[in-house]
Amino acid sequence: MRLPIFLDTDPGIDDAVAIAAAIFAPELDLQLMTTVAGNVSVEKTTRNALQLLHFWNAEIPLAQGAAVPLVRAPRDAASVHGESGMAGYDFVEHNRQPLGIPAFLAIRDALMRAPEPVTLVAIGPLTNIALLLSQCPECKPYIRRLVIMGGSAGRGNCTPNAEFNIAADPEAAACVFRSGIEIVMCGLDVTNQAILTPDYLATLPELNRTGKMLHALFSHYRSGSMQSGLRMHDLCAIAWLVRPELFTLKPCFVAVETQGEFTSGTTVVDIDGCLGKPANVQVALDLDVKGFQQWVAEVLALAL
């Protein structure tokens, strides 16, 4: 039986690969997409997500979400993904539109209609998920688990200790981590290992039209290089759903720093139990890189 999932995203070049995997992995049933401001503005992430759905002729409803973090000013990652968020490929025009309600309400409504609890996957800042949990707490029993790409047990990628998705809205992340729902965190500890090699990248233009599109996007992606390999951060959250055996997880207490002058946005991962607090997150700490690369090749070969 396919696993029903809702995907919250901020496309983003590596988001595009994750969306492809969510659509084409035969084990998954992507039922709803929502967008959030992150890599670029929410208007741009929504446009990019709709372009991808049109590219794949995927009839998946999409709702636009939060334009700004809960408390602080927005930050983006246009230096990594380009000003549009998906620089490098010219998508054809379409007339698709997002749903007429905010993302967190679209998630609420879909959860309440679902015949069984649904897995949420969040590969951008956690603003929409925090709004859902704070404004609609009645939804918690209908969430099977939340799988996120975000955080780190060690170093960061936008500050010395903070990963971008958490640092973009630390207050939202803190709300989510305190919520009591089951959380799997695929952070930089594994995503920095999730590298597609130059040899594989060179094969993409001949793979299928998805491969051609991704190859064009990758030429503008600044998380690695076409010559040294590219890190597929967001794809790890999808990979865990399908191939959890590729990941080494440890239950840990995780809190999000929201006040520190130099540490705001840091995920404080208590690997050794120093704080004596119960674990609230399953933290991915290691990755079978070869197995991950093989799975990516398999799932992208299934794309249109």
From Swiss-Prot:
<dbReference type="GO" id="GO:0006206">
    <property type="term" value="P:pyrimidine nucleobase metabolic process"/>
</dbReference>
<dbReference type="InterPro" id="IPR015910">
    <property type="entry name" value="I/U_nuclsd_hydro_CS"/>
</dbReference>
<comment type="similarity">
    <text>Belongs to the IUNH family. RihC subfamily.</text>
</comment>
<dbReference type="GO" id="GO:0006144">
    <property type="term" value="P:purine nucleobase metabolic process"/>
</dbReference>
<dbReference type="GO" id="GO:0005829">
    <property type="term" value="C:cytosol"/>
</dbReference>
<dbReference type="InterPro" id="IPR023186">
    <property type="entry name" value="IUNH"/>
</dbReference>
<dbReference type="Pfam" id="PF01156">
    <property type="entry name" value="IU_nuc_hydro"/>
</dbReference>
<dbReference type="InterPro" id="IPR001910">
    <property type="entry name" value="Inosine/uridine_hydrolase_dom"/>
</dbReference>
<protein>
    <recommendedName>
        <fullName>Non-specific ribonucleoside hydrolase RihC</fullName>
        <ecNumber>3.2.-.-</ecNumber>
    </recommendedName>
</protein>
<dbReference type="InterPro" id="IPR036452">
    <property type="entry name" value="Ribo_hydro-like"/>
</dbReference>
<keyword id="KW-0326">Glycosidase</keyword>
<dbReference type="GO" id="GO:0008477">
    <property type="term" value="F:purine nucleosidase activity"/>
</dbReference>
<dbReference type="InterPro" id="IPR022976">
    <property type="entry name" value="Nucleosid_hydro_RihC_nonspecif"/>
</dbReference>
<comment type="function">
    <text>Hydrolyzes both purine and pyrimidine ribonucleosides with a broad-substrate specificity.</text>
</comment>
<dbReference type="GO" id="GO:0006152">
    <property type="term" value="P:purine nucleoside catabolic process"/>
</dbReference>
<dbReference type="GO" id="GO:0045437">
    <property type="term" value="F:uridine nucleosidase activity"/>
</dbReference>
<keyword id="KW-0378">Hydrolase</keyword>
<feature type="active site">
    <location>
        <position position="233"/>
    </location>
</feature>
